[in-house]
Design a protein with these regions (language model features):
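Short coil/turn residues that cap or connect secondary-structure elements
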Residues: 19-23, 77, 93
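Short beta-strand scaffold positions
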Residues: 75-76, 98
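Short Gly/Thr/Asp-enriched flexible loops that form oxyanion-binding sites at enzyme active sites
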Residues: 80-94
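Residue-level preference for short coil/turn positions at secondary-structure junctions
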Residues: 5, 69, 92, 137-138
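Short, solvent-exposed amphipathic alpha-helical segments in soluble enzyme
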Residues: 26-28, 90-91, 159-160
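ATP/NTP phosphate-donor binding region
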Residues: 1-72, 83, 87
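Catalytic core of DAGKc-family lipid kinases
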Residues: 12, 16, 38, 47, ...
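A short acidic Gly-Thr/Ser loop motif
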Residues: 77-79, 102
């Protein structure tokens, strides 16, 4: 049942995650068709850096909270993009949709969200919001895990490779080898 008033849908996408508004495959147009068929009015926001992210998310939240229909805020990117969007939306009642465009998409897989972009959009447009647990350590939130040791080094090195050589799935493997061969560090933990 479609309401007469359109519901806001803010599509927050990481320009590094492979999603483009102007794509040859027309995926953005297909997404907006799926969303508008369910009464959503889509507005896209490209994120380039963390300062811009904070500014855009403040604007997006104000728009959604001012609307009689809170709508949906969609994170289009990987787990990092999703985590940053969730951090801003955490203390609101606004649902977050996931368009999984990252390398691993752990959260989307954990929640059973289709990895196909258009199928994930259909879930966002027609599905029911589900609550999920969120962990908080200091000022950071974690949707699927928090890691110590080698894994965070792998991720940092992979992002370095992506920044230097462009975004390729192969970097997940080559950066891990680089960490194992050159970047080993001793980690001491103290528990109380």
């Amino acid at each position: 049942k479609m309401s007469n008033q359109s519901k806001p849908l803010s599509l927050i996408y990481n320009h590094n995650a492979g999603f483009r508004i102007q794509g040859p495959e027309g995926s953005y147009e297909q997404l907006t068709e799926i969303f508008s068929a369910q009464g959503y009015q889509t507005k896209a926001y490209e994120i380039n850096d963390s300062q811009q992210f904070d500014k855009i998310m403040t604007e997006v939240l104000e728009q959604h909270l001012a609307s009689s229909e809170s709508g949906i805020i969609v994170a289009a990117g990987g787990d990092g993009t999703l985590n940053t969007v969730a951090k801003h939306v955490l203390n609101t009642q606004i649902p977050v949709g996931i368009l999984p465009l990252g390398t691993f998409n752990y959260v989307a897989r954990l929640l059973g969200i289709p990895l196909d972009l258009l199928e994930a959009a259909k879930v966002i447009a027609t599905g029911q919001p589900q609550r999920m647990n969120v962990a908080r350590i200091n000022q950071e939130i974690y949707l699927n895990n928090a890691s110590l040791g080698l894994y965070p080094l792998f991720i940092k090195k992979r992002e370095d490779y992506n920044r230097i050589f462009g975004r390729l799935p192969l970097h997940a493997y080559t950066s891990a080898l680089d960490v194992l061969i050159r970047d080993r560090k001793e980690l001491k933990l103290k528990s109380w």
